[in-house]
Regions:
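Output/docking surface of receiver
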Residues: 95-107
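Conserved acidic segment of CheY-like receiver
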Residues: 1-10
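Short beta-strand/loop segments at the ligand-binding rim of alpha/beta enzyme cores
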Residues: 65-78
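Short hydrophobic/Thr-rich beta-strand motif most characteristic of the beta2 strand and flanking loop
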Residues: 24-32
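Conserved active-site segment of CheY-like receiver
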Residues: 8, 79-82
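Conserved phosphotransfer microenvironments
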Residues: 50-66
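Acidic, metal-coordinating helix/loop segments flanking the phosphotransfer/catalytic sites
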Residues: 32-47
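Alpha4 helix (beta4-alpha4-beta5 surface) of REC/receiver domains from two-component response regulators
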Residues: 83-97
């Protein structure tokens, strides 16, 4: 599986890449939201993981472009601190396939990476 991770948090990147290594999933980590759609297409990503702790993400635009512009379905999972209720709600409204707290995400990241 190919996955793209959008996060500027090096600890998040490290943990997700470690989980990817265990599941033989290639993880392309990005810290620039402007590169997400292009990178998902380049690596033929099946999964996009979005860290909602990042500032200035136009998630509605990213989700819309990925859902409309690719022949391959990209599952979009957004995660963030449980105290950021507005960001979690906005991710749901934007059309993410799954939205979860950071704790839920890290508890299930290996399962997410195997499909």
């Amino acid at each position: 599986m190919q996955a793209v991770l959008l996060s500027a948090d090096l600890m998040v990147v490290s943990r997700v890449q470690g989980a990817g290594a265990k599941s033989s999933t290639a993880i392309r980590a990005l810290s620039n939201p402007a590169l997400v759609v292009e990178t998902c297409g380049e690596v033929e990503a099946e999964l996009l993981l979005v860290d909602l702790a990042m500032p200035s993400i136009d998630l509605e635009s990213i989700v819309g472009q990925l859902k409309a512009g690719t022949s391959r379905a990209v599952r979009i999972v957004a995660f963030g601190p449980h105290v950021h209720e507005d960001r979690l709600a906005a991710a749901r409204a934007a059309g993410c396939d799954a939205v979860m707290s950071r704790g839920q995400f890290f508890a299930s990241v290996e399962a997410l990476l195997v499909g």
